[in-house]
Amino acid sequence: MYEEIFNQIRSAANKRNLKDSTIHAYCTSVAHFLNHTAKDIDALTTDDVDIFLTEKKLSGISPETYNHYHSGIRFFYKKILKMNWDDDDIPRMKRDRKLPAVLTKAEISAILDATPNLKHKAMIATMYSGGLRVSEVTHLHYDDISRTNKTIHIRDGKSRSDRYTLLADRTLEILTEYWFQCGRPRGILFPSSWTGDYLTKDSVIQFFRESAERAGIQKHVSTHCLRHSFASHLFESGCDIKYIQALLGHRDPKSTEIYLHVSNKTLLGIKSPFDEMGGE
């Protein structure tokens, strides 16, 4: 019904090197908006957006969902319709800056011990070792692991920029065992056993949840807790926030400062917290 509009959005978004997932989200948001207004494109005004977003807010949706709608419709109005858009008149919804859940080192060890599948264990260890997002660990390739430099190369992450992060000795040991016992993959590091393609995010989230339950973790945890724990444990060891920001791939310092404070160390000699777990 709106295919021509979606094609215009895709074209404009591709020129700006936006990710496919972002483009899909924009099209979905615009489709919801257009279905709600039921107006001809030429008759749309910013008042229509205000009414739509106000109704969404009153329905009790989360700030994240509200802002997804906002971003997609804003892009549509500014880049496709070439209409003025005042962020003061149609603001984004402020999010609660909640402290993220952080796992202790003992809890992470327990989760690893409760993970019988070697591939799953290697993925959990890798996420904690370098603070990886689920989408980043699923898209790792064999060549992204540097045994010499003890680094993990994250390609085309969420911010559309490459970075390097830490590879713990303990993680390398687990990865080596996994590699030799699970087919010695030379392309995708953690391929699906069924398709040979990238694992889905949902499958990783599911097996991590099952491992946490087997480990007896009582708090509500997610795979993202490994990333938060990586950053928090680095900070506790004295690592400067700007280096943690770089390792996480955060462009906005506020994304890191939600759970960290400034310290005084340099990147030289920084160890992954996985290498400092000892007997905890």
Predicted segments with their positions:
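Conserved catalytic core of the tyrosine transesterase superfamily
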Residues: 1-280
